[in-house]
Amino acid sequence: NRYDAVRGWGARQDGETIRRDTAPPLDEAIIGLSGLPPHHLGWGQFRAMGAAALDLCAVADGRLDGYVDCSVDAHGVWDYAGALLVCSEAGVEVADAHGRDLCVLDPEVRRTPVAGASPTLADALLEARRTF
């Protein structure tokens, strides 16, 4: 799959516009994980594909409903920056688990991205992630 996005012009997968407006509740959602959480976070199912950008784009295109980075500040901006724009343009909420800015220039800085295909799911995932 190939993803592209231009700020203000939307996001595409293989040339087709992608947009997320809704998501199931957390207990029915399919969530992408990076790392292992210390306890079940309430999802219906989970997947672990091994690449933050791929997982985030899967939320944007509808293959996943959300994404949680369960590691402790393991991702540099290069791990997710392109996918962050795709998600933003597709209507997906993405935030750092600790409320910090995800767009940073310092290559030493690490972040913990969490995404949800709807604001309600994003809030539920952020709340669950903050339990550890």
What does each model-identified segment do?
Residues 12, 18-132:
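An extended, acidic
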Residues 1-8, 12:
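DPxDG-like acidic metal-binding loop motif
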